[in-house]
Amino acid sequence: MNNLRKTHPLIKIVNHSFIDLPTPSNISSWWNFGSLLGLCLIIQILTGLFLAMHYTSDTSTAFSSVAHICRDVNYGWLIRYMHANGASLFFMCIFLHIGRGLYYGSYTQTETWNIGVVLLFTVMATAFVGYVLPWGQMSFWGATVITNLLSAIPYIGTTLVEWIWGGFSVDKATLTRFFAFHFILPFVIAALAVIHLLFLHETGSNNPSGLNSDPDKIPFHPYYSVKDLVGFFMTILVLLTLVLFTPDLLGDPDNYTPANPLSTPPHIKPEWYFLFAYAILRSIPNKLGGVLALVASILILILVPLLHTSYQRGLAFRPLTQMLFWILVTDLLTLTWIGGQPVEQPFIIIGQLASILYFLLITTLIPLTGLLENDLLKW
């Protein structure tokens, strides 16, 4: 068996990725989120598959098919709420995973990082089209508002929006194609995740010290496989607590009203995990400018490796940049809060200041502080 593990063409790949993989001996629980994202993806694909067996992607029956899943299908309510809250958990893990990468300088592995940014865009697209499927008020109006943003693209905008809609408004054709996209994209995510791992295993994992860990590696199994299992159980506990006690905590009550094109909800807002980007979009009083800022708020992650100025990889021994990092985290939380507030003062000005600070920190303040710390090292 031992020999088969190392010689069999298929088992050999698994062995090199999850069993005999040389791993730094000092990686903390912040390194658990990669495997937790894999767990989230598996949960989402499985629950999504069972939901798709009962869901109908037609405007006249979509809303009632979701109600039917919750009322009549065996444990349908459990599957539906695990899928809905699983998405929130997915994004929670993504944000912590990216935060870890920023803090410990994992972005210096540029291929892995860039594939990660592509993964983030794909997951965001999947979540967006998925939110439209229950065909409630917020589903319909969210789809209308967000797809409408593309009309800001000069010359081709209007044509592009009508092409995506499959008509002159969000309707039956839109819902059907969004269901198709929502079904296929998770498999694209799975493929990208494999490439993400492929590039990661070319260089090996980073570690909290940011130093080369080649002299001190241990096998992934049993050490980190068991450590990952602990993370799995804790995460499943959090998910089940959310699903069984407060399943609607993170949802919008408006989505329990069937979609009605003739009645606009008082506050159109996306799910909590998009609120920071939504706040940046709304902070610019120009449509095209807002769309560009929205895309830039995520795309800016591509620039992070290029803006690394410090002699040190992570922030473990850089107190000044550490302070700026936590200001960035606070700023993102502020943007998330603002995204859920109505467009009125003082929220408008707070959102604009938080948006400016967000871009300023990443592009200017953190790189300059890195240079300052380099000089301080020479004292």
Curated annotation (Swiss-Prot):
Classification via PANTHER family: CYTOCHROME B
Family: Belongs to the cytochrome b family.
Record: residues binding a ubiquinone: 201
Obligatory cofactor(s): heme b
Record: residues binding heme b b562: 83, 182
Domain of life assignment: Eukaryota
Protein name per UniProt: Cytochrome b
One example GO MF annotation: ubiquinol-cytochrome-c reductase activity
Compartment(s) of residence: Mitochondrion inner membrane
UniProt GO BP: mitochondrial electron transport, ubiquinol to cytochrome c
Transport among keywords: yes
Binding site for heme b b566: 97, 196
Matches recorded under Gene3D superfamilies: Cytochrome Bc1 Complex, Chain C
Subunit structure, as described in the record: The cytochrome bc1 complex contains 11 subunits: 3 respiratory subunits (MT-CYB, CYC1 and UQCRFS1), 2 core proteins (UQCRC1 and UQCRC2) and 6 low-molecular weight proteins (UQCRH/QCR6, UQCRB/QCR7, UQCRQ/QCR8, UQCR10/QCR9, UQCR11/QCR10 and a cleavage product of UQCRFS1). This cytochrome bc1 complex then forms a dimer.
Stated role: Component of the ubiquinol-cytochrome c reductase complex (complex III or cytochrome b-c1 complex) that is part of the mitochondrial respiratory chain. The b-c1 complex mediates electron transfer from ubiquinol to cytochrome c. Contributes to the generation of a proton gradient across the mitochondrial membrane that is then used for ATP synthesis.
Protein's organism: Ornithorhynchus anatinus
Keywords (A to Z) from UniProt: Electron transport, Heme, Iron, Membrane, Metal-binding, Mitochondrion, Mitochondrion inner membrane, Respiratory chain, Transmembrane, Transmembrane helix, Transport, Ubiquinone
Misc remark: Heme 1 (or BL or b562) is low-potential and absorbs at about 562 nm, and heme 2 (or BH or b566) is high-potential and absorbs at about 566 nm.
Principal place of residence: mitochondrion
Annotated transmembrane regions: 33-53, 77-98, 113-133, 178-198, 226-246, 288-308, 320-340, 347-367
Gene: MT-CYB
